[in-house]
C-alpha cells in the first residue's frame, strides 16, 4: 500500500471559499466526501485528513497559511510522514488553462503561481505531480484580482461536473500511474455539452 500526500492549494476562510484560487481546496473537499473521510484535523499548519482509497493510503492537506506560504505546511507533512517529492500530488488553479479543463504534469516551474513558488522554495524543487485546474484568464483587468474573485454563476453551474471529473482523474492516477492518466485526461473538457 503506497502512501501519497495530496495537497489542495487555496486560502483559508469563508471570504475565499468560492474563489478561483481555491480550486485546490474545492477538489480536496470533494475527494474527502467521496472517500468518506474529512479534512478537519488541525495539523501541519493546515487542515488534514487521511483514508484509504483504491488500495493506497491518502493523506489530504489544505494548508491554512495563505497561498504564498503553502510550502511550510507541505514541508511539515512530508517530513513527518517521511515522504519524498515523488509521493506528493498538488492540486491548484491555473490561469493558462480554460475553465473546465485540467492538465497534469510532473515537475516544472511555478509559472508565477505563488503557492507553487512557496512549495518549490520550501521543498527544494518542483519534482512533484501537479493537477492544474483551469480557471481561464480575465478578458481585462488584473490576474490577481481575478483569481481572488468568486467563480461566475455560469462557472459555479459547471463546478460539480468538473469536481467529479477531477476525482475520477485522481482515482485513475492512484490506480494506474501518471502516463496512463495523462493520456486519458490531459486537456479533457469536463463541462457537460451545452
Swiss-Prot record:
| Coiled-coil stretches noted in the UniProt entry, renumbered to this chain | none
Matching entries from InterPro entries are given as: Pept_tRNA_hydro, Pept_tRNA_hydro_CS, Pept_tRNA_hydro_sf
Localized where?
Answer: Cytoplasm
- Enzymatic reactions: an N-acyl-L-alpha-aminoacyl-tRNA + H2O = an N-acyl-L-amino acid + a tRNA + H(+)
Record-annotated site: Discriminates between blocked and unblocked aminoacyl-tRNA: 11
Query: Where along the sequence does the record put site: Stabilizes the basic form of H active site to accept a proton?
Result: 93
Key words, A-Z: Cytoplasm, Hydrolase, RNA-binding, tRNA-binding
One molecular function GO term is:
tRNA binding
Pfam families the UniProt entry points to = Pept_tRNA_hydro
Q: Name one GO cellular component term.
A: cytoplasm
Record-listed tRNA binding positions: 16, 66, 68, 114
Biological processes, Gene Ontology terms = protein quality control for misfolded or incompletely synthesized proteins; rescue of stalled ribosome
The record's similarity note reads: Belongs to the PTH family.
What is the role of this chain?
A: Hydrolyzes ribosome-free peptidyl-tRNAs (with 1 or more amino acids incorporated), which drop off the ribosome during protein synthesis, or as a result of ribosome stalling.
State what protein this is by name.
Peptidyl-tRNA hydrolase
| Organism of derivation | Geobacter metallireducens (strain ATCC 53774 / DSM 7210 / GS-15)
Amino acid at each position: 500500500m503506497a502512501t501519497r500526500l495530496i495537497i489542495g492549494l487555496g486560502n483559508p476562510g469563508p471570504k475565499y471559499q468560492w474563489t478561483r484560487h481555491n480550486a485546490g481546496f474545492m477538489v480536496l473537499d470533494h475527494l474527502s466526501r467521496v472517500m468518506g473521510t474529512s479534512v478537519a484535523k488541525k495539523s501541519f499548519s493546515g487542515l488534514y485528513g487521511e483514508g484509504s482509497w483504491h488500495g493506497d493510503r491518502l493523506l489530504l492537506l489544505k494548508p491554512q497559511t495563505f497561498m504564498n506560504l503553502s510550502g511550510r505546511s507541505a514541508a511539515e507533512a512530508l517530513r513527518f510522514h517521511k515522504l519524498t517529492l515523488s509521493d506528493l500530488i498538488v492540486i491548484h488553479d491555473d490561469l493558462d488553462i480554460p475553465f473546465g479543463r485540467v492538465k497534469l504534469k510532473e515537475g516544472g516551474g511555478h509559472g508565477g503561481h505563488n503557492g507553487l513558488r512557496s512549495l518549490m522554495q520550501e521543498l527544494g524543487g518542483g519534482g512533484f505531480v501537479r493537477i492544474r485546474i483551469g480557471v481561464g484568464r480575465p478578458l481585462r483587468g488584473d490576474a490577481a484580482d481575478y483569481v481572488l474573485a468568486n467563480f461566475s454563476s455560469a462557472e459555479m453551474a459547471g463546478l460539480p461536473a468538473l469536481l467529479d471529473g477531477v476525482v475520477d482523474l485522481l482515482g485513475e492516477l492512484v490506480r494506474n500511474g501518471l502516463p496512463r492518466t495523462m493520456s486519458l485526461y490531459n486537456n479533457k473538457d469536463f463541462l457537460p455539452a451545452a
